[in-house]
């Protein structure tokens, strides 16, 4: 549909009204510049990044603004801005449609990992073909919410996937227990001395976190503040997200 001239003239007022309604729905007025940041901001994010990177950082933001609340929605699916499921969404796929503001938040690296004891008792992995002797841990294929997490077929189609889970944390714990090899985010697995990278040069992937919010949310001070804070986190954590 195309707006008429009258419609275009009314659009700013309509957007302002919608922003005010959103503010009331989140428990605070749309304009919080004088009273400080207040109300609720919902942030949708992938499980690993939300748990390990964002949650500790957001604690700082909520300490600075005691009247601000954050709902961190770390769920294994794509949240829909159009349905108001979140105010800000961090995803692995760039939104291609809708009236949204989108920015690149950060890249992050993933590698193939195995428990050191598991690797010691199983055949040596010197090249990709050696992976056929190993068990794997991965996602549940028919519940995968984005093609960006399809790694194993690119690496070496496994003969046996010993354990599947929609949760990256569950996959990580299974690998720690010796269930098999898995592609895990470096920011999750590199910190663990129990794990070691496998084929570190060949079995490496880089993905991108995209951050988006509805265009009308730019009128909300608290949403703008959380957006800017998350951008800062992405910049500050860049070396951790893509380590050497």
What does each of the following model-derived ranges do?
Residues 34-41, 132:
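Immediate post-signal peptide segment of exported/extracytoplasmic ligand-binding proteins
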Residues 209-221:
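A bilobed periplasmic-binding-protein/Venus flytrap-type ligand-binding module shared by bacterial periplasmic
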Residues 218-232:
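Short amphipathic alpha-helical coupling segments at ligand-binding clamshell hinges
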């Amino acid at each position: 549909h195309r707006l008429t001239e009258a419609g275009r003239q009314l659009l700013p007022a309509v957007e302002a009204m919608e922003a005010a309604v959103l503010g009331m729905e989140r428990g605070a007025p749309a304009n919080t510049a004088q009273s400080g940041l207040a109300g609720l901001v919902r942030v949708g994010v992938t499980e690993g990044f939300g748990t390990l990177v964002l949650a500790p950082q957001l604690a700082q933001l909520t300490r600075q603004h005691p009247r601000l609340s954050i709902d961190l929605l770390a769920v294994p699916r794509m949240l829909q801005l159009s349905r108001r499921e979140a105010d800000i969404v961090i995803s692995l796929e760039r939104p291609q449609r809708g009236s949204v503001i989108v920015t690149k938040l950060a890249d992050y690296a993933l590698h193939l990992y195995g428990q050191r004891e598991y690797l010691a008792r199983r055949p040596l992995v010197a090249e990709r073909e050696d992976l056929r002797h190993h068990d794997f841990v991965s996602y549940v294929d028919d519940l995968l919410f984005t093609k960006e997490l399809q790694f194993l077929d690119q690496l070496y189609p496994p003969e046996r996937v010993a354990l599947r889970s929609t949760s990256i944390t569950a996959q990580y714990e299974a690998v720690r227990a010796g269930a098999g090899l898995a592609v895990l985010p470096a920011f999750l697995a590199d910190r663990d001395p129990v794990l070691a990278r496998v084929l570190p040069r060949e079995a490496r992937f880089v993905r991108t976190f995209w951050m988006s919010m509805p265009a009308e949310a730019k009128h909300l001070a608290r949403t703008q503040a959380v957006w800017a804070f998350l951008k800062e986190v992405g910049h500050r954590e860049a070396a951790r997200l893509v380590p050497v």
